[in-house]
């Protein structure tokens, strides 16, 4: 599968990785999950002046849109794994599992948030108990 080959560079889906990392580190507050599982990006967007480089949201959506639809989920899985490894190396033990859960939770919905055609939700195996899709 060429998708797996594609996720070798640390550069790959860089904005996605940044976003996943940012979400993982947030315990509450910020644009994480609202109750119905939709994102609340509005706050994020308003802080960005028009003169700044495109907000992270736009960057990672561009990255995903450049992937082949077939590769979107495998590549996101790769990105999630990379972020997970970063967190496991650097953060203190406490709360780590929760962060990892948040990475996968966030990644699962990125295609939908970015309106990727043909992909809405990536069926990652959840690390938490509950249905695995």
Curated annotation (Swiss-Prot):
Matching entries from InterPro entries are given as:
Bifun_inhib/LTP/seed_sf, Bifunc_inhib/LTP/seed_store, Napin/2SS/CON
Concerning SUPFAM superfamilies, the annotation shows: Bifunctional inhibitor/lipid-transfer protein/seed storage 2S albumin
* Source organism, top-level taxon: Eukaryota
Which residues are the propeptide, according to the record? 31-49, 131-133
* Keyword Disulfide bond in record: yes
Pfam families, per database record: Tryp_alpha_amyl
Q: What is the reported tissue distribution?
A: Cotyledons and the axis.
**Similarity field:** Belongs to the 2S seed storage albumins family.
What does the subunit section of this Swiss-Prot or TrEMBL entry state?
The mature protein consists of a small and a large chain linked by disulfide bonds.
This protein is called what?
Napin-1
- Organism in which the protein naturally occurs: Brassica napus (Rape)
């Amino acid at each position: 599968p060429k998708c797996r080959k594609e996720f070798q560079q640390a550069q790959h889906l860089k904005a996605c990785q940044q976003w996943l990392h940012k979400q993982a580190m947030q315990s509450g507050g910020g644009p994480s999950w609202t109750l119905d599982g939709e994102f609340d990006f509005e706050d994020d967007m308003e802080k960005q002046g028009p003169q700044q480089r495109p907000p992270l949201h736009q960057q990672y959506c561009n990255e995903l849109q450049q992937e082949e639809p077939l590769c979107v989920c495998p590549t996101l899985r790769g990105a999630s794994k990379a972020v997970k490894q970063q967190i496991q190396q650097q953060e203190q033990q406490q709360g780590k599992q929760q962060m990892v859960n948040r990475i996968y939770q966030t990644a699962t919905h990125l295609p939908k948030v970015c309106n990727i055609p043909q992909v809405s939700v990536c069926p990652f195996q959840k690390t938490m108990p509950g249905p695995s899709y």
